[in-house]
Amino acid sequence: MKDWLDEIHWNADGLVPAIAQDHKTGRILMMAWMNRESLALTVRENRAIYWSRSRGKLWRKGEESGHLQKVHEVRLDCDADVIVLQVEQLGGIACHTGRESCFYRVFEDGAWKVVEPILKDPDAIYHAGHRHE
């Protein structure tokens, strides 16, 4: 029997993009990367665990900020190369900038315009020197 993780088309680095989506509203909250271990742990623990490429280690979303993502459903796209996590974003903040979503800029009139407010000052969320969860 084929392992469910083997059905995923991992990139050359053994990663797959993962989109976190609010399970009630459908709003896209963020995009991060997952490897086999992080996806297996996410399914086992029902909380989002990603792979941090910059730190080269597992990234348990919310372990520094308290803004955990409780996973309600895991979906795989038709090409088996993108994951969607339907999550409950605890604390209402997914972005390390203190916003609800990492997608807070809109392209208008030839420039990127910030359209989402900062809900909480990142300095009040993170320990010194640890901004990008």
UniProtKB/Swiss-Prot annotation:
SUPFAM superfamilies: HisI-like (SSF141734). Homodimer. Mg(2+) binds at D77, D79, D81. GO terms for molecular function: magnesium ion binding; phosphoribosyl-AMP cyclohydrolase activity; zinc ion binding. Zn(2+) binds at C78, C95, C102. Catalyzes the hydrolysis of the adenine ring of phosphoribosyl-AMP. Its EC number is 3.5.4.19. Binds 1 Mg(2+) ion per subunit. Binds 1 zinc ion per subunit. Its main location: cytoplasm. It comes from Azotobacter chroococcum mcd 1. It catalyses: 1-(5-phospho-beta-D-ribosyl)-5'-AMP + H2O = 1-(5-phospho-beta-D-ribosyl)-5-[(5-phospho-beta-D-ribosylamino)methylideneamino]imidazole-4-carboxamide. InterPro entries: PRA-CH, PRib_AMP_CycHydrolase_dom, PRib_AMP_CycHydrolase_sf. The keyword Thylakoid does not apply. Pathway: Amino-acid biosynthesis; L-histidine biosynthesis; L-histidine from 5-phospho-alpha-D-ribose 1-diphosphate: step 3/9. Its cofactor is Mg(2+); Zn(2+). This is Phosphoribosyl-AMP cyclohydrolase. It is found in: Cytoplasm. Belongs to the PRA-CH family. GO terms for cellular component: cytoplasm. Keywords: Amino-acid biosynthesis, Cytoplasm, Histidine biosynthesis, Hydrolase, Magnesium, Metal-binding, Zinc. GO terms for biological process: L-histidine biosynthetic process.
